[in-house]
């Protein structure tokens, strides 16, 4: 998925603003099994999935608990690291060979103060993530694992 498609999923940005954002991105490839984000580390980058699938998990009592699966177009960020500059609790592992766009957190924050459209995109992203988190929480509290899996397949059929 092209970066323009990824960005415009959240907020349609003028080309000039999108070009400013594009200039700060680097495209990278990683193999299946690579940990894009690691628990216990302060992450300095944000990733967008151009091609691939990722799972986010945390460990509890020696077990990995997957709480999110992302596909092409998804954004990978440790919110704890992004917001508070603290080590994150999640690990994000690639489920197949993948191509990602990488954006340094400090560059994004600078763009927020320089470009209103990029700042509005960031605000919209935060709003959408809050809604998605709320939906996951309600789902986890109200459904057994098989029901959650069925719901995932219905929402994300590909």
Can you say where each PLM-predicted feature lies in the sequence?
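Conserved catalytic core of Hanks-type protein kinase domains
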Residues: 24, 69, 143
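Cyclic nucleotide-binding regulatory module and flanking cytosolic helices
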Residues: 1-27, 81
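Polybasic "coupling" helices that flank or enter modular domains
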Residues: 93-96, 101-158
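Hydrophobic residues at beta-strand termini and immediately following loops
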Residues: 28-30, 70
């Amino acid at each position: 998925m092209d970066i323009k498609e990824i960005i415009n999923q959240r907020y349609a940005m003028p080309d000039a603003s999108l070009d400013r954002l594009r200039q700060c991105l680097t495209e990278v490839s990683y193999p299946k099994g690579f940990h894009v984000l690691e628990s216990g580390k302060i992450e300095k980058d944000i990733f967008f999935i151009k091609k691939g699938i990722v799972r986010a998990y945390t460990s509890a009592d020696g077990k990995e608990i997957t709480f999110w699966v992302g596909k092409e177009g998804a954004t990978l960020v440790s919110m704890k690291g992004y917001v508070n500059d603290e080590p994150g609790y999640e690990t994000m592992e690639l489920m197949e060979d993948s191509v990602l766009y990488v954006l340094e957190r400090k560059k994004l924050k600078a763009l927020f103060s320089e470009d209103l459209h990029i700042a509005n995109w960031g605000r919209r992203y935060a709003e959408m993530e809050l809604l998605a988190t709320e939906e996951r929480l309600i789902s986890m509290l109200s459904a057994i694992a098989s029901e959650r899996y069925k719901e995932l397949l219905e929402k994300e059929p590909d």
